[in-house]
Amino acid sequence: GKVVIGEGELDEAPMLYIGEELGRGNGPEIDIAVDPVEGTNFVAKNLPGSMSVLAVAEKGKLLNAPETYMEKIATGSHVPKGSMDIDFSVEKNINIYSDITNKKKSDITVCILNRPRHSKIISELKRLNVNVKLITDGDVSGALLVSDKKYDVDIFMGIGGGPEGVIVAAALD
């Protein structure tokens, strides 16, 4: 398999970099997206919540992007693909979600990393009277909250790591 998105270059790590070949070379050709330590701050502070995550797909099926931050928006499978878009305003996406699910804005919960880069999004969500669930770290686990109603998270949005975004997209697909 070949790493198409990973952590090596961004974190100055010697392994799991884009283009790295893994395996014995005699199996099927696959693409790999990997985040060896999701929740690095949890590990550094000896807290629970970190995990290792990866996505594997047929060659050419995973986004091959530079190791960088990316804008993200995730919802459960009850929202038709393409209905919401990172290029739409926060308000437009919330309105679309509200229309699709017949939920009042005050009943919608958005999960987002508590980062200064998200201050405008958080302010906009509060202005719209949307519930905001702030998390300190772990945008993979935060985004996956939308996949099960027991967590009461409707939307995950914000800016986070590229590998995590590709992995979450594969998991939710």
Residue ranges of each PLM-predicted region?
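Short acidic, glycine/serine/threonine-rich loops at helix termini
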Residues: 14-17, 44-47, 65-68, 121-125, ...
